[in-house]
């Protein structure tokens, strides 16, 4: 890597001045036809020597097959709405292995935890606890998620960040001010805006956009939900594996607590150690194993109902809940913390929506998961009416003796699959947070060439493993882990309730009565459960709160520092007046080649460009300001990836390229492919720009009423991204042919010397090579900042920047073609 490490002072930055955002681009400066090409300049007596070798790197030609390989099938969105019934059934079967593993393993420990707090003294205790479990599953997973929350998806994507991005599209609540009107041209972005007739929706939108504290509260809410999901990634493996292994305590002599802890740790280490290989090779086994597990639960439940006490179906009467609380009072309130464990993993129904479809998840839950879980809990309750002393290990005691070992093996596999699903969900959640600028940059490894969603984040993986081992080693009991588990689960559910309510009011424009019923009903139930689990803070409930606080702090500091850094870059932009004073030579020598200057600005010229002009003795003939931008949509179609604009007059040969990605997009294209696509799209932009100029000159001879229609058509076309442009509709083409004779436009295009000059200059610069110009920046708080801001920026944010992935590695650019300049941002 070749670097120019120059410590940039504020003075050197100010020398290039600041400019008004109203003059971002200057168009209309005609190219002087007498100006020679760079090849002609090269023949003169200029000796560039080592300088040219440093600034120019010859790129390898990209194979066209590589370009076609980037067109990933299905990356344009979810085409799962009109699937046949048979296909939907197949997808529903697959959801069993990914979505419902966590909820499916809950019968291992729910009643054990409930009756550790409420001793069984009579039949009312068993029926009351069973009734609580039944209606908890019916209200939260069935009524809330299946019938309401799943519909609040973002183009088929679910989860906390999907809801946040959906809200960001309807109201400008993103704290990073890099939104552009052109983003709304993305096919997956375009949605129906709140209608003017509904003043309520517009009022909420205006309040969210104008009041900074509401933006901050919304961001904190989303980050809290994300932190709780990461906490689930720690607690789910520990809880599931320990619960499955606890079956050996009563079956194998000498298998005590120490053996349980050690065996659980061994399985956890093995589970996290194989993450780097991905789940593609064994993923096909997940659904069959979980299907076998669910049908085993249902079969064992039916067996126990028929053998012990079929009358426990009386628990379908909710009056037994009232009797349960009247009889046990405070102990019953404490038992709610164990009851909530029956819906662990309910959030996965929404978070994993992107891999399946709404209909398939609904079908799997209503037809398989829900009835099998009810039968399992009813069967355990029937067994407890005859054997109340077996509450400590009710699941394995209720299994027929002859089936113990087969069920134990299936339970262990189901626990590992449930843990795997939560670990994968944590990886995906962290990746989405990184894409939206809320998490430090980390190395992401894609473990599958066929499925773009399978990723592996080494730092997060080993962190989760260490935390799981600590949780198992410290608590040594599923009862104490359950106290922590409940807080994390309820916290995530309450966040989704608030966000879905906001979606109802802002986007769906639901009737105000129905919209308020949602938080009143489900929010009240979740609040009751939250108050119940919070009473267990001293008994293990503090663990998820510590994890959530830690990750919330990290994510908010990173977002806060990133926003301040972006605002500093906006303030220090180079003015257009200064660029005009420099002239087309930019006050230095322009040599053949293309300089790709990476920056975060979507408007204006970044101050780091002035630093390169001061530092380098020459600059490339073509400069492209490249901005990698994540927009609040799941995926951006490949043909809509690049957006080009011209910067400065034409003879400057400077452009802005915004490469747009969704928060679910995978940036793993080869640098050569990226370069080829970028150059191709730039050529198309130049041709479209010349076409627009030709149209403007031709339209002057036509009727204004007819011209305005055609002008709008072409203007919309030019505003769209320029790779593999979709063909316009036939009516539009017919209209254009009526208004504008194709012969006149075509002849003017062919005879345009300015276009031929620019294309020749671009091809010559491409042949000379591409160089990546990067900023190696440091962020510091201003001297007059308050103490807290200095502490956060100069120490915490600086620590995160030093230890996160470097910009060059994160941008996936070739290291041999890099020039870096140092710079300090004062915020």
From Swiss-Prot:
Belongs to the HAK/KUP transporter (TC 2.A.72.3) family. This is Putative potassium transporter 12. GO terms for cellular component: nucleus; plasma membrane. It is found in: Cell membrane. It comes from Arabidopsis thaliana. InterPro entries: K+_transporter, K_trans_C, K_trans_N. Residues 104-129, 238-253, 303-335, 385-402, 476-480, 523-536 are extracellular. Residues 738-748 have a biased composition (Low complexity). GO terms for molecular function: potassium ion transmembrane transporter activity. It holds the Pfam family K_trans_C. It is a multi-pass membrane protein. Residues 1-82, 151-216, 275-281, 357-363, 424-454, 558-827 are cytoplasmic. Putative potassium transporter. PANTHER family: OSMOTIC STRESS POTASSIUM TRANSPORTER (PTHR30540), POTASSIUM TRANSPORTER 12-RELATED (PTHR30540:SF4). It comes from the Eukaryota. Keywords: Cell membrane, Ion transport, Membrane, Potassium, Potassium transport, Transmembrane, Transmembrane helix, Transport. GO terms for biological process: cotyledon development. The chain crosses the membrane at residues 83-103, 130-150, 217-237, 254-274, 282-302, 336-356, 364-384, 403-423, 455-475, 481-501, 502-522, 537-557. Residues 1-31, 728-750 are annotated as: Disordered.
């Amino acid at each position: 890597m070749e670097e120019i490490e120059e410590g940039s002072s504020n003075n050197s930055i100010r020398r290039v001045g600041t400019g008004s955002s109203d003059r971002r681009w200057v168009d209309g400066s005609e190219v002087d036809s007498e100006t020679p090409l760079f090849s002609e300049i090269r023949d003169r007596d200029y000796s560039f020597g080592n300088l040219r070798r440093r600034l120019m790197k010859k790129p390898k030609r990209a194979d066209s097959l590589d370009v076609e390989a980037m067109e990933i099938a299905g990356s344009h969105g979810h085409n799962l709405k009109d699937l046949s019934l048979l296909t939907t059934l197949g997808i529903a079967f697959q959801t069993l292995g990914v979505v419902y593993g966590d909820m499916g393993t809950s019968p291992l420990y729910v009643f054990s935890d409930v009756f550790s707090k409420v001793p069984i003294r009579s039949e009312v205790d068993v029926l009351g606890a069973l009734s609580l479990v039944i209606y908890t599953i019916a209200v939260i997973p069935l009524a809330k998620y299946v019938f309401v929350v799943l519909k609040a998806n973002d183009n088929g994507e679910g989860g906390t960040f999907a809801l946040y991005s959906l809200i960001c599209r309807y109201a400008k609540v993103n704290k990073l001010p890099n939104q552009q009107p052109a983003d709304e041209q993305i096919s997956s972005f375009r949605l129906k805006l709140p209608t003017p007739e509904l003043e309520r929706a517009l009022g909420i939108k205006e309040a969210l956009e104008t009041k900074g504290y509401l933006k901050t509260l919304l961001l904190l809410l989303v980050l809290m939900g994300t932190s709780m999901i990461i906490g689930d990634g720690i607690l789910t493996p520990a809880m599931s594996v320990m619960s499955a292994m606890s079956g050996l305590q009563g079956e194998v002599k000498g298998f005590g607590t120490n053996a349980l802890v050690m065996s659980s740790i061994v399985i956890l280490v093995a589970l996290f150690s194989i993450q780097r290989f991905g789940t593609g090779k064994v993923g096909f086994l997940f659904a069959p194993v979980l299907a076998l597990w669910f049908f085993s639960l249902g079969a064992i439940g039916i067996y126990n109902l028929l053998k012990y006490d079929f009358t426990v179906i009386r628990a379908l009467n909710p009056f037994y809940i009232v009797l349960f609380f009247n009889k046990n009072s405070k102990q019953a309130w404490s038992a709610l913390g164990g009851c909530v464990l029956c819906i662990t993993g309910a959030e996965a129904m929404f978070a994993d929506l992107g891999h399946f479809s709404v209909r398939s998840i609904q079908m799997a839950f209503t037809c398989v998961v829900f009835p099998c879980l009810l039968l399992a809990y009813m069967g355990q309750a029937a067994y407890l009416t005859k054997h109340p002393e077996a509450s400590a290990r009710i699941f394995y005691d209720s299994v027929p003796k002859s089936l113990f070992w087969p069920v134990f093996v299936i339970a262990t596999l189901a626990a590992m699959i449930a843990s795997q699903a939560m670990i994968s969900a944590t990886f995906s959640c962290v990746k989405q947070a990184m894409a939206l600028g809320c998490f430090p940059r980390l190395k992401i490894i894609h473990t599958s060439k066929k499925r773009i969603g399978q990723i592996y984040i080494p730092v997060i993986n080993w962190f989760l493993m260490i935390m799981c081992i600590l949780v198992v080693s410290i608590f040594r009991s599923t009862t104490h882990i359950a106290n922590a588990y409940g807080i994390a689960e309820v916290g995530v559910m309450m966040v989704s309730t608030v966000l879905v309510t906001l979606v109802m009011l802002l986007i769906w424009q639901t009737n105000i009565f129905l919209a308020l019923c949602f938080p009143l009903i489900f929010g009240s139930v979740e609040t009751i459960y939250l108050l119940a689990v919070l009473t267990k803070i001293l008994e293990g409930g503090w663990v998820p709160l510590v994890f959530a606080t830690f990750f919330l702090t990290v994510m908010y500091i990173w977002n806060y520092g990133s926003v301040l850094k972006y605002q500093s870059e906006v303030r220090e932009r180079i003015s257009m007046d200064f660029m005009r004073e420099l002239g087309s030579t930019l006050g230095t020598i322009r040599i053949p080649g293309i300089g790709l200057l990476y920056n975060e600005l979507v408007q204006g010229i970044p101050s780091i460009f002035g630093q390169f002009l001061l530092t380098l003795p020459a600059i490339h003939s073509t400069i492209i300001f490249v901005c990698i931008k994540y927009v609040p949509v799941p995926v951006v179609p490949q043909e809509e990836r690049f957006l080009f604009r011209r910067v400065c007059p034409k003879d400057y040969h400077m452009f802005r390229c915004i490469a747009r990605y969704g928060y679910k997009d995978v940036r793993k294209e080869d640098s050569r492919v990226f370069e080829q696509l970028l150059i191709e799209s730039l050529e198309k932009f130049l041709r479209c720009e010349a076409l627009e100029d030709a149209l403007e000159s031709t339209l002057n001879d036509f009727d204004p009423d007819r011209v305005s229609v055609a002008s709008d058509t072409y203007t919309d076309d030019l505003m769209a991204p320029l790779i593999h442009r979709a063909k316009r509709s036939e009516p539009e083409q017919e209209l254009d042919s009526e208004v504008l004779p194709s012969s006149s436009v075509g002849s003017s295009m062919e005879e345009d010397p300015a276009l031929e000059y620019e294309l020749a200059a671009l091809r010559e610069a491409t042949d000379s090579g591409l160089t990546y110009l990067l900023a190696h920046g440091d962020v510091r708080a201003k001297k007059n900042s308050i103490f807290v801001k200095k502490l956060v920026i100069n120490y915490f944010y600086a620590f995160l920047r030093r230890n996160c992935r470097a910009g060059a590695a994160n941008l996936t650019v070739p290291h041999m073609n890099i020039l870096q300049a140092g710079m300090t941002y004062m915020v």
